Each structure stands twice: as structure tokens, then as C-alpha cells.
């Protein structure tokens, strides 16, 4: 059968961009269909603009610490921050798709090889679904009459609100809570769990939670929102404890929903699982082998870097025979929370290792015991590594300055099944925060030297 294109990609977020740009570079006939903006949520209303906000907020905090709080000195105007964010978006997407035809329309399946958009039908041998997710609004009394902020609208504010309630305690909630607090907004976080960052390392999450509270962020844990209403003064939220919270704005950051309803997946024979994820196998194929689902829509890992990686793997698998295809589940996924301090993790967590009965050792080095961290006034934090019986590196958690860069070394170690001695004999630049990773290996080794038999062996070889 002759097709109009080799490949049609629906959605141009991180996953769709990877598929479309790489496919075109490989000589394939590619058509990309995007409903809104190139870059998807990450580039336009997610990880990229949020880092611009965080950067501005950190500068304000640094200025306050260096100069002292000067009464009446306002934070930088939000419109200047927004202008910078617009500049980032323009620079990021400019000229990227000169060689890839892009159609800005809503797409849906006619059948398993045919996609319709804007009244036109096009066929392809391979089709990639990369539609991502969108923010979930709370289902509480009065919610339909309240204008919630989400990450999709937060960066369009004309000014920093005087106060804001944030529903949720995950990455988006935490990053925006700290950023807006440092920019002069009074923040109250409402979190159903016993702490924020409930999926992360407990010690690291509690360190960040206390840091937030020290900066003036109010955190209500073990609390559920029951009802909400719009008042003349702004927002009134009633919790399950009966407390009434008042603020100028409210941000919903407590969940995500899938964004493929308009695709008519049933026309293509593409199935979803009980949780709504598009069902994929280890090669990222859906229930139709020539249709792939990449990124958030398959529910595997809701991270932009994971989406990009899946796009690359799926494109390779679409071209290769089965025996050469790659299992996307075998690649570790590091994750970083861009709070201050940053929190990064990769591999097995301490909780999972204990729950599965794995025999392992936890090695910890604290920033406060490292001269460079003290000198740079970033002494809050630690590096924690989980080492198996044979010395294999099973996972790592880093909370502190630069952890988002440091975690990549540990991701390579976990994926390649390296042993802690591999890091011990790897020279690290000094004095950098990354040197703390080598300190972990040194600490592990020094503990071995405490054993009497080891000391005897050392003395024996020294006398030869």
C-alpha cells in the first residue's frame, strides 16, 4: 500500500519533537500535527518557563541575603520576567522545523493508518501519538464557579498576586510555591499527605519542607480541600478541618489528566488501560503494532526528558527488526525537583529496596561537611547512595546545590551497573559539588578499612 507519509506525529511536545526532527533528519517523509504550540507544555507552560521564574526568584533571595531586606524595595516586575520567558520560547523553537511540514489543527483517527485534520485526510505507514497531559482541576464543591490557575495560565499573570493557595505537594506545587513566595506572594500549600513530595526520599523531602517553612511558606499537611468559592476579596477555600483559607489566587497543581479524547482512538483500534494510559509494550507499540505512543500519554514517566528519550527509542524501533529493537523500560530515568535546594533521584529508592527485602548499604555524605559547600554558603543537603552487597550502585538521592547536574553521573552508574569502586577510581574536579559523589565512594571504602582482617592484609602487603 502506498502512503502519503512514512510517519505522522500527533503532538509536538518533547516526545513529538524528538520523533519529527529525528525522523526528518533520517530521510523519512514526516508530517507533524500540533493543536496549539510547538514545544508542548514543557517549553511553553512547564519546565522551561518555570526555570525562568525560579531563576528570578533565586536572584531576589540572594539580593536579600547579601544586602539585607530593604523596606519598600519591590521584587522585579512580573512583566519583565514574562518578557524573558517569551524570549526563551521564541529562541527555542526558531528554525527547528524548517524541514518538517507542520499542520496546526486538531487531529483524529479515521482508521489505523489515516489521520484527519482540518477537513483533510492523510495516511502514514507509522503513526506516533505524543499528546501529553493537561492539569487536572479539583473536583470539590464550588470548583465550577472558580477560576483556578494552572501551569497553563500561571505564566500569563500580569502581576505577582499578594497571596495564593496552592493545591498539591508535588514538583509543580513546590517549585511555584518557593518561586512566588520569594517574589513577594504569601503562599499556603494544601497537601493531603503527611508531607510534601510524598513520592520522594523522606529525609530529603522533609529537609525541603522545613526550608519552605523557614522562608515563610505555610504548609498544611494531612489536609483536604472540601469546598471553594469566589468572593469579593478573592478566593475562599474550606478544608476538611473546617479552616477557611483566603487568598487572591488559587493554583491547582495536584494531578494530571490525559489529553487524547479528540483522537478517536477506537477508530484506530488503540486501547487504553484501567488508569487511562494508552497501552504500550516494551517497544512503545500500542495495540496496533504500527502505532506508537510516546511521552506522558502512555503514563510510564511524566518527565520531559523521559518523553524525548521515548521518542528516540520508538523511532528506532519503528525502523528496526524485532531482534534489534530496544526495551524502553531498561533505561533509568533520573528526576530533579528544581527547588532551592534541588532534589534529584535515580534508580531504586531506599523505601523500595527495604520493601523488596534487598540487602544494601546506605552511604551518606553531607554538604555541611564539605569545605566548598560551606564556602559557597550552600551547606544544606546531602548525597545518599544505595550500594548492593557486591558494591553495585543501586540508586542515589541528592538534595543540595547542583544536584540536577550531579545526578546524571549516578544515572549512568545505575544504568551501566557500575560498582562504587568505579567512582572511587574516577578523578573528579575539585572543588566542585560533584566531588561529593567521589566522597561517597571514599566513605564506602574507608568503612571497609575498619575491619581487622582488612588491616592485616594491608600490613602484610606493605611489608613485602
Protein language model regions, located:
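Glycine-rich dinucleotide-binding loop and its adjacent helix/turn
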Residues: 47, 131-190, 218, 266-268, ...
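Glycine/Thr-rich phosphate-binding loops of Rossmann-like dinucleotide-binding domains
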Residues: 18, 124, 137-139, 175, ...
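Flexible, glycine-rich terminal cap/loop adjacent to redox cofactors
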Residues: 8-36, 48, 52-59, 339-349, ...
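FAD-site-proximal beta/loop scaffold in flavoenzymes
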Residues: 144-161, 244-322, 409, 424
Amino acid at each position: 500500500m502506498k502512503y502519503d507519509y512514512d510517519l505522522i506525529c500527533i503532538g509536538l511536545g518533547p516526545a513529538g519533537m524528538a520523533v519529527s526532527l529525528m525522523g526528518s533528519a533520517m530521510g523519512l517523509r514526516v508530517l507533524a500535527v500540533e493543536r496549539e504550540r510547538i514545544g508542548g507544555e514543557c517549553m511553553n507552560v512547564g519546565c522551561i518557563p518555570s526555570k525562568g521564574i525560579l531563576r528570578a526568584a533565586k536572584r531576589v533571595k540572594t539580593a536579600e541575603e547579601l544586602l539585607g531586606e530593604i523596606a519598600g524595595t519591590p521584587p522585579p516586575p512580573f512583566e519583565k520576567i514574562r518578557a524573558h520567558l517569551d524570549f526563551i520560547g521564541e529562541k527555542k523553537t526558531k528554525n527547528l522545523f524548517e524541514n518538517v511540514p507542520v499542520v496546526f489543527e486538531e487531529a483524529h483517527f479515521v482508521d489505523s493508518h489515516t489521520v484527519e485534520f482540518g477537513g483533510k485526510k492523510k495516511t502514514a505507514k507509522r503513526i506516533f501519538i505524543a499528546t501529553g497531559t493537561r492539569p487536572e482541576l479539583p473536583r470539590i464543591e464550588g470548583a465550577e464557579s472558580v477560576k483556578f490557575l494552572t501551569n497553563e495560565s500561571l505564566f500569563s499573570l500580569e502581576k505577582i498576586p499578594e497571596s495564593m493557595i496552592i493545591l498539591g505537594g508535588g514538583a509543580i506545587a513546590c517549585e511555584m510555591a518557593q518561586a512566588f513566595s520569594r517574589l513577594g506572594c504569601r503562599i499556603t500549600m494544601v497537601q493531603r499527605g503527611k508531607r510534601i513530595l510524598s513520592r520522594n526520599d523522606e529525609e530529603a523531602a522533609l529537609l525541603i519542607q522545613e526550608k519552605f517553612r523557614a522562608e515563610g511558606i505555610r504548609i498544611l499537611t494531612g489536609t483536604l480541600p472540601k469546598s471553594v468559592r469566589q468572593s469579593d476579596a478573592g478566593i475562599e477555600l474550606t478544608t476538611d478541618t473546617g479552616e477557611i483559607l483566603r487568598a487572591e489566587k488559587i493554583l491547582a497543581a495536584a494531578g494530571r489528566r490525559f489529553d487524547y479524547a479528540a483522537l478517536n482512538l477506537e477508530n484506530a483500534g488503540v486501547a487504553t488501560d484501567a488508569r487511562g494510559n494508552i497501552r504500550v509494550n516494551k517497544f512503545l507499540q500500542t495495540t496496533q503494532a504500527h502505532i506508537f505512543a510516546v511521552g506522558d500519554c502512555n503514563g510510564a514517566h511524566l518527565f520531559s526528558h523521559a518523553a524525548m528519550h521515548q521518542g528516540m527509542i520508538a523511532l528506532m524501533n519503528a525502523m528496526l527488526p524485532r531482534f534489534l529493537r530496544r526495551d524502553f523500560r531498561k533505561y533509568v530515568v533520573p528526576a530533579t525537583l528544581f527547588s532551592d535546594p534541588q532534589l534529584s533521584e535515580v534508580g531504586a529508592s531506599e523505601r523500595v529496596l527495604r520493601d523488596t527485602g534487598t540487602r544494601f548499604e546506605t552511604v551518606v555524605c553531607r554538604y555541611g561537611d564539605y569545605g566548598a559547600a560551606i564556602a559557597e554558603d550552600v551547606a544544606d543537603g546531602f548525597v545518599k547512595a544505595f550500594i548492593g552487597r557486591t558494591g553495585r550502585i543501586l540508586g542515589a538521592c541528592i538534595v543540595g546545590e547542583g544536584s540536577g547536574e550531579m545526578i546524571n553521573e549516578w544515572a549512568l552508574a545505575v544504568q551501566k551497573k557500575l560498582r562504587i569502586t568505579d567512582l572511587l577510581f574516577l578523578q573528579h574536579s575539585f572543588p566542585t559539588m560533584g566531588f561529593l559523589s567521589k566522597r561517597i565512594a571514599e566513605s564506602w571504602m574507608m568503612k571497609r578499612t575498619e575491619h581487622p582482617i582488612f588491616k592485616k592484609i594491608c600490613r602484610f602487603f606493605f611489608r613485602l
